[in-house]
């Protein structure tokens, strides 16, 4: 049964719902990519698909727009797959369970993928709708944006004529983004040596955190579960001999982790528990505003896994304690804008290696490199190694932008007020595509999406309606 079929704009929501029936998390984009190609083929459009599953669909200009310069509509097909504790949904294999609650669209127990499925839905609807007037329309749908903009990095832009681009990957209506931070993922690998150790084995769990986007919400003071876990383990090791067995937390480096778990073997279980309980009470006070749901649990468990030896445990706890996290510098040019940050988004443990994955962001290239150097220096001092993956450049503000001025004028007429024009502390593909398309004039915008990258994600229906109207009018005036 179609859940969104009664919503307007009808085709935008229908296409979005069709997308949601197809699993399309990052690194799982072949099916959704093929679906986009089939959509274009059905309309008889010029289309391209590459090995990274990027898709380009091109529609000719509508009558009267043949001499107007081409316009690019751009978004990404992958979504962040997060779900509530206890949710049985296999997001690699199953579609989403959508619901409508008043003016909101959500997915039961999981992320919705409005970031950036709504861009795909609007772009495809614009291609299909014969009442939408536009120049040559070049729809660029990239993959794996959420794990380092990997699709955009390898996109062949040869088919593209446009040097004006509407990126529909912003989550707050009325804000036009015209610049963003650069960034990338840093993988810090620590080799592990394991040996027998007699004692009581405990499971330590941190849960109930708010989490959120590691770029635009990094300055909200929210706790990082991996950082809290490092503090707890350090406190326990201070009162009794402790060996780390495993530590895990988070699943996306660009999402602030909401939970983490570790297994340790200790000489004195009672002392370890008391130390954890004492620190947990202090942490709850620290985060009573930002993370009122913070919970710490310690319980006895059994494990067949060997713990790490004393030296390795010390190195692992040092890494968890000393890895920088959060806001590192604020912009001196734009009040209130984060300039440099990082997020320890993923912590995972294998038999012979522990890995912490950090999302590093900065609008200043030299500061981005400085943070990477810190991570490399610390990790190598502990005997580990570092890999940098998915590097992307900052998107620099363009002083002279005809597209921005056109969008401001349309917005003013439709809304009766001025839009907010800003740069953001988050990564957008505009920087990468701007490098490939010299002279690219680009603005990022979109409807209201709240709590993206979390199961609380919601898309606002009325905002989608207004944003669609804005998009259609901007296309109409693109000549």
Residue ranges, per PLM feature:
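Acidic/His- and Gly-rich active-site-bordering loop/insert found
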Residues: 2-103
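Zn-dependent metallopeptidase/amidohydrolase metal-coordination segment
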Residues: 9-12, 332, 339-341, 345-352, ...
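A short beta-alpha structural unit
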Residues: 17-21, 250-252, 261, 295-307, ...
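Active-site metal-coordination/substrate-binding segment of hydrolases
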Residues: 65-163, 198-201, 310-314, 321-325, ...
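Fold-level recognition of mixed alpha/beta catalytic cores in primary-metabolism enzymes, strongest
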Residues: 134-225, 233, 237
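His/Asp/Glu-rich mid-to-C-terminal helical/loop segments that flank catalytic regions of hydrolases
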Residues: 222-239, 268-269, 315-321, 329, ...
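A structural supersecondary motif
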Residues: 239-252, 332-348
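A conserved active-site cap/scaffold subdomain adjacent to cofactor or substrate pockets
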Residues: 253-330
């Amino acid at each position: 049964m179609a859940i969104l079929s009664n919503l307007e704009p009808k085709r935008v929501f229908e296409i979005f719902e069709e997308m949601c029936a197809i699993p399309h998390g990052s690194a799982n984009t072949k099916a959704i990519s093929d679906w986009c190609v089939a959509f274009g083929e059905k309309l008889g459009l010029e289309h391209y698909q590459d090995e990274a599953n990027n898709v380009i669909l091109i529609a000719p200009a509508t009558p009267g727009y043949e001499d107007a310069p081409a316009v690019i509509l751009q978004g990404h097909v992958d979504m962040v797959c997060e779900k509530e504790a206890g949710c049985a949904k296999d997001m690699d294999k199953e579609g989403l369970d959508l619901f409508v609650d008043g003016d909101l669209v959500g997915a039961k127990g999981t992320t919705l993928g409005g970031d950036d499925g709504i861009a795909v839905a609007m772009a495809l609807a614009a291609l299909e709708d014969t009442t939408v007037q536009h120049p040559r329309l070049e729809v660029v749908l990239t993959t794996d944006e959420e794990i380092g903009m990997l699709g955009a990095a390898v996109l062949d832009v040869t088919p593209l004529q446009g040097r004006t681009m509407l990126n529909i990957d912003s989550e707050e209506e009325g804000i036009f983004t015209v610049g963003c931070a650069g960034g990338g993922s840093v993988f810090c690998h620590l080799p592990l040596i394991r040996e027998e150790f007699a004692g009581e084995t405990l499971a330590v769990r941190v849960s109930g955190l708010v989490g959120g986007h590691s770029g635009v919400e990094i300055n909200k003071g929210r706790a990082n579960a991996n950082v809290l876990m490092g503090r707890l383990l350090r406190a326990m090791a201070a009162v009794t001999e402790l060996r780390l067995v495993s530590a895990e937390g988070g699943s996306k480096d660009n999402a602030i982790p909401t939970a983490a778990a570790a297994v340790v073997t200790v000489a004195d279980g009672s002392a370890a528990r008391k130390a954890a309980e004492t620190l947990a009470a202090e942490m709850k006070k620290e985060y009573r505003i930002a993370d009122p749901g913070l919970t710490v649990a310690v319980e006895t468990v059994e494990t067949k896994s060997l713990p790490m030896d004393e030296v390795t445990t010390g190195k692992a706890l040092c890494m968890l304690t000393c890895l920088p996290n959060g806001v590192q510098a604020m912009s001196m040019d734009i009040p209130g804008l984060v300039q440099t940050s990082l997020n320890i988004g993923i912590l995972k443990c294998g038999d012979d290696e522990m890995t912490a994955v950090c999302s590093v962001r900065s609008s200043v290239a030299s500061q981005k490199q400085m943070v990477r150097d810190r991570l490399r220096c610390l990790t190598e001092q502990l005997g580990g190694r570092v890999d940098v993956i998915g590097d992307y450049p900052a998107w620099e503000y363009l002083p002279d932008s005809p597209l921005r001025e056109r969008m401001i004028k349309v917005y003013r007429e439709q809304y009766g007020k001025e839009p907010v024009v800003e740069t953001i502390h988050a990564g957008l593909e505009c920087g990468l595509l701007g490098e490939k398309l010299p002279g690219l004039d680009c603005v990022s915008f979109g409807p209201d999406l709240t709590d993206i990258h979390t199961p609380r994600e919601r898309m606002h229906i009325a905002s989608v309606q207004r944003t669609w109207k804005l998009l259609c009018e901007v296309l109409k005036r693109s000549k």
